[in-house]
Amino acid sequence: MIGRLRGTLAEKQPPHLILDVNGVGYEVEVPMTTLYRLPSVGEPVTLHTHLVVREDAHLLYGFAEKRERELFRELIRLNGVGPKLALALMSGLEVDELVRCVQAQDTSTLVKIPGVGKKTAERLLVELKDRFKAWENMPTIAPLVMEPRASATVSSAEADAVSALIALGFKPQEASRAVAAVPGEDLSSEEMIRQALKGMV
């Protein structure tokens, strides 16, 4: 099991990134909540990781905090929840927001996540309620720190943001509309994704 990687951020193409560790490039998939906290390409970064072994591939998932990784592990233990849906849930909601959603049994918020229908949301809330009792007193994740990406043009940032939303399960039309509705100019793709998800969820 690969539990942690420390290296240089070589590439960042949401929701994937390449982490260079002593000359070896590890492809890692991350939730958007982790992506927002990543430094610029070329900077050092440490990720807490979870390895999924399948017959056709070994897949690495990375997280900025151990708490995020533990949430991911809790989610994929649930019946019918795979890594893709777990990442979609974690991209749409911060850890604390998801915990509060479960405590309040709030299906209306969960159904806004791609891949989550009403029945799935109701089942997730029931199954997670007892599991999340221990999470109430855990330390919260550090505030998000956005890194500027001066080299990115608006058009490429928009394209990256749309691609990331589609990878999370949103329909192309939904992703394009959400990104187009983001206010402001010269935003990084990470900020566009964050604002678009906020508007959709």
UniProtKB/Swiss-Prot annotation:
Task: Please provide the record's keywords in A-Z order.
Answer: Cytoplasm, DNA damage, DNA recombination, DNA repair, DNA-binding
Tell me more from the record: Probably part of a ruvC-ruvA-ruvB operon. Does not seem to belong to the SOS regulon, no LexA binding site has been identified in the promoter region.
Q: What does the record give under GO molecular function?
A: ATP binding; four-way junction DNA binding; four-way junction helicase activity
- What does the entry's domain section say? Has three domains with a flexible linker between the domains II and III and assumes an 'L' shape. Domain III is highly mobile and contacts RuvB.
Q: Where is this region: Flexible linker?
A: 144-152
Gene symbol of the encoding locus: ruvA
**Residue ranges, annotated region (Domain III):** 153-201
Q: Where in the cell is it found?
A: Cytoplasm
Query: Where is region (Domain II) located?
Result: 65-143
One Pfam family, short name please? HHH_5
UniProt-listed HAMAP family: DNA_HJ_migration_RuvA
The UniProt function text for this chain reads:
The RuvA-RuvB-RuvC complex processes Holliday junction (HJ) DNA during genetic recombination and DNA repair, while the RuvA-RuvB complex plays an important role in the rescue of blocked DNA replication forks via replication fork reversal (RFR). RuvA specifically binds to HJ cruciform DNA, conferring on it an open structure. The RuvB hexamer acts as an ATP-dependent pump, pulling dsDNA into and through the RuvAB complex. HJ branch migration allows RuvC to scan DNA until it finds its consensus sequence, where it cleaves and resolves the cruciform DNA. Complements an E.coli deletion mutant.
Q: Tell me the protein family, please.
A: Belongs to the RuvA family.
The segment annotated Domain I runs over 1-64
- This chain belongs to which protein, by name? Holliday junction branch migration complex subunit RuvA
Name the Gene3D superfamilies for this protein: 5' to 3' exonuclease, C-terminal subdomain, DNA helicase RuvA subunit, C-terminal domain, Nucleic acid-binding proteins
Which GO biological-process labels does this protein carry?
DNA recombination; DNA repair; SOS response
Chief location category: cytoplasm
Q: Cellular component GO terms, alphabetically?
A: cytoplasm; Holliday junction helicase complex; Holliday junction resolvase complex
Source lineage? Bacteria, Pseudomonadati, Pseudomonadota, Gammaproteobacteria, Pseudomonadales
User: What quaternary arrangement does the UniProt entry report?
Assistant: Homotetramer. Forms an RuvA(8)-RuvB(12)-Holliday junction (HJ) complex. HJ DNA is sandwiched between 2 RuvA tetramers; dsDNA enters through RuvA and exits via RuvB. An RuvB hexamer assembles on each DNA strand where it exits the tetramer. Each RuvB hexamer is contacted by two RuvA subunits (via domain III) on 2 adjacent RuvB subunits; this complex drives branch migration. In the full resolvosome a probable DNA-RuvA(4)-RuvB(12)-RuvC(2) complex forms which resolves the HJ.
Q: Which organism is it from?
A: Pseudomonas aeruginosa (strain ATCC 15692 / DSM 22644 / CIP 104116 / JCM 14847 / LMG 12228 / 1C / PRS 101 / PAO1)
